[in-house]
Amino acid sequence: MEAKLLVLFCTFAALKADTICIGYHANNSTDTVDTVLEKNVTVTHSVNLLENSHNGKLCSLNGIAPLQLGKCNVAGWLLGNLECDLLLTANSWSYIIETSNSENGTCYPGEFIDYEELREQLSSVSSFEKFEIFPKASSWPNHETTKGVTAACSYLGASSFYRNLLWMTKKGTSYPKLSKSYTNNKGKEVLVLWGVHHPPTTSEQQTLYQNVDAYVSVGSSKYNRRFTPEIAARPKVRGQAGKMNYYWTLLDQGDTITFEATGNLIAPWYAFALNKGSDSGIITSDAPVHNCDTKCQTPYGALNSSLPFQNVHPITIGECPKYVKSTKLRMATGLRNVPSIQSRGLFGAIAGFIEGGWTGMIDGWYGYHHQNEQGSGYAADQKSTQSAIDGITNKVNSVIEKMNTQFTAVGKEFNNLERRIENLNKKVDDGFLDVWTYNAELLVLLENERTLDFHDSNVRNLYEKVKSQLRNNAKEIGNGCFEFYHKCDDECMESVKNGTYDYPKYSEESKLNREEIDGVKLESMGVYQILAIYSTVASSLVLLVSLGAVSFWMCSNGSLQCRICI
């Protein structure tokens, strides 16, 4: 009985032993990240690298409003289509907006030669100065400048023509050869537009220009071309059997352009001195223009984000994240978030870091939980936590800085005859996009794996730090915790945490308690062995007595015959 009481007392004393545990932070975060080896790992903290939202608005870009062309397209705006009069004073923009119904372009049917290239050139233009390159009143005294009108370009119910071009016809009965030059003295490139008319019949050719064998010649240091009218019957378009082809060139500073013609010239009236240097672009969007400002615009809406990637739209203008096909790019900064199930016994034992993290520790990533006669509590290890925060912050910033190359990505322009080139270009762009997406996803997977391993290593290092201090003054109890062989008050606990634990000071007490506990274990084992032998012998005797009694009863009533032979 004394042995049993001694064992119970020792068990009770063991439960009261002072303990210290090493563990890590946990919280109620539901953030998940992917690693090379795992999917949807819940972590305490993470940062998102992928922007997937927009405001649904077309905004000013860095304080400069866009140019909304409305129902007009670039051709109608530059030629001066009468339906585009609201754009006559437009001279600066951050980007240009066409809509899905921007159909007012060339009112007189024909081709706009190298139109796609012109649109591409406008991607680097943010403003221009519109000026009369050849004043209407004084430039063409020998030719008619008021009768060149058409019902195809009507205005207020009357025939008219483009605002920026002059359709010159014969004056009286003659169309004398004309020659007119302009020298660029604007200090910047000048955009010059003109046209050539192709009548359907020789009769119309003579009616308009008198000369049947007319020509148009345009020349500069970089452009030189001679045109002859293509007189042929054509199906009517917009009520016209004739056609006009439209041309353009960029005239360098100091260069001279000369127009020479004996008929069929659609002469430039206004030209545009271009201000280049900024990233502009042309987007097609039906989103509304609002009084807002952004640094990045997509056709769907503005992005106000400093993230390195976005999956909103591949077409962007301004300082924009790189477009990728990914749906999730989240980088882990914290630890695996596995809150421990805090099963509490008589003295409220706390599960250690092997079983899960601590939601009670809120001021650090790694730390301690202690329990002694003075109470219990959590304390973060600030040094290891701060070192980890600094390292991970630097890593995240470095990744964002390296990948956050912000730029404009506008669509490339191709005409109907360049479909094979366009298709090839799309395949190349898709290939680059796949590579960018793969690189971004792989980078995040690898860094997440490294971050979680880094945290695991830090917890293990903290555990080993405590273990190396305590040595045999405490024992490991298998859940990230140590049980002291001596009394460890709050001052003692603090010394373990800050690395100043005095091992010799507690070694003698620990040695005595270790020996006492080991002795109790041995004595308890001897008692249990004696009890086991006694129990076995007693059970055997009871069995023999019972068997004898049954046999005697059976013999007495004749159920069993007993013979004793001598």
From Swiss-Prot:
<keyword id="KW-1015">Disulfide bond</keyword>
<keyword id="KW-1160">Virus entry into host cell</keyword>
<feature type="topological domain" description="Extracellular">
    <location>
        <begin position="18"/>
        <end position="529"/>
    </location>
</feature>
<feature type="glycosylation site" description="N-linked (GlcNAc...) asparagine; by host">
    <location>
        <position position="104"/>
    </location>
</feature>
<feature type="lipid moiety-binding region" description="S-palmitoyl cysteine; by host">
    <location>
        <position position="565"/>
    </location>
</feature>
<feature type="glycosylation site" description="N-linked (GlcNAc...) asparagine; by host">
    <location>
        <position position="304"/>
    </location>
</feature>
<dbReference type="GO" id="GO:0046761">
    <property type="term" value="P:viral budding from plasma membrane"/>
</dbReference>
<keyword id="KW-0472">Membrane</keyword>
<dbReference type="InterPro" id="IPR000149">
    <property type="entry name" value="Hemagglutn_influenz_A"/>
</dbReference>
<keyword id="KW-1165">Clathrin-mediated endocytosis of virus by host</keyword>
<dbReference type="GO" id="GO:0075512">
    <property type="term" value="P:clathrin-dependent endocytosis of virus by host cell"/>
</dbReference>
<feature type="disulfide bond">
    <location>
        <begin position="488"/>
        <end position="492"/>
    </location>
</feature>
<dbReference type="GO" id="GO:0039654">
    <property type="term" value="P:fusion of virus membrane with host endosome membrane"/>
</dbReference>
<protein>
    <recommendedName>
        <fullName>Hemagglutinin</fullName>
    </recommendedName>
</protein>
<feature type="glycosylation site" description="N-linked (GlcNAc...) asparagine; by host">
    <location>
        <position position="27"/>
    </location>
</feature>
<feature type="topological domain" description="Cytoplasmic">
    <location>
        <begin position="551"/>
        <end position="566"/>
    </location>
</feature>
<keyword id="KW-1032">Host cell membrane</keyword>
<feature type="disulfide bond">
    <location>
        <begin position="296"/>
        <end position="320"/>
    </location>
</feature>
<keyword id="KW-1164">Virus endocytosis by host</keyword>
<feature type="site" description="Cleavage; by host">
    <location>
        <begin position="344"/>
        <end position="345"/>
    </location>
</feature>
<dbReference type="GO" id="GO:0055036">
    <property type="term" value="C:virion membrane"/>
</dbReference>
<keyword id="KW-0812">Transmembrane</keyword>
<feature type="signal peptide">
    <location>
        <begin position="1"/>
        <end position="17"/>
    </location>
</feature>
<feature type="transmembrane region" description="Helical">
    <location>
        <begin position="530"/>
        <end position="550"/>
    </location>
</feature>
<comment type="similarity">
    <text>Belongs to the influenza viruses hemagglutinin family.</text>
</comment>
<feature type="disulfide bond">
    <location>
        <begin position="107"/>
        <end position="153"/>
    </location>
</feature>
<keyword id="KW-1133">Transmembrane helix</keyword>
<dbReference type="GO" id="GO:0016020">
    <property type="term" value="C:membrane"/>
</dbReference>
<feature type="lipid moiety-binding region" description="S-palmitoyl cysteine; by host">
    <location>
        <position position="555"/>
    </location>
</feature>
<keyword id="KW-1162">Viral penetration into host cytoplasm</keyword>
<dbReference type="InterPro" id="IPR013828">
    <property type="entry name" value="Hemagglutn_HA1_a/b_dom_sf"/>
</dbReference>
<keyword id="KW-1161">Viral attachment to host cell</keyword>
<feature type="lipid moiety-binding region" description="S-palmitoyl cysteine; by host">
    <location>
        <position position="562"/>
    </location>
</feature>
<keyword id="KW-1043">Host membrane</keyword>
<dbReference type="GO" id="GO:0019031">
    <property type="term" value="C:viral envelope"/>
</dbReference>
<feature type="glycosylation site" description="N-linked (GlcNAc...) asparagine; by host">
    <location>
        <position position="28"/>
    </location>
</feature>
<feature type="disulfide bond">
    <location>
        <begin position="59"/>
        <end position="292"/>
    </location>
</feature>
<keyword id="KW-1167">Clathrin- and caveolin-independent endocytosis of virus by host</keyword>
<keyword id="KW-0945">Host-virus interaction</keyword>
<keyword id="KW-0261">Viral envelope protein</keyword>
<dbReference type="GO" id="GO:0020002">
    <property type="term" value="C:host cell plasma membrane"/>
</dbReference>
<keyword id="KW-0732">Signal</keyword>
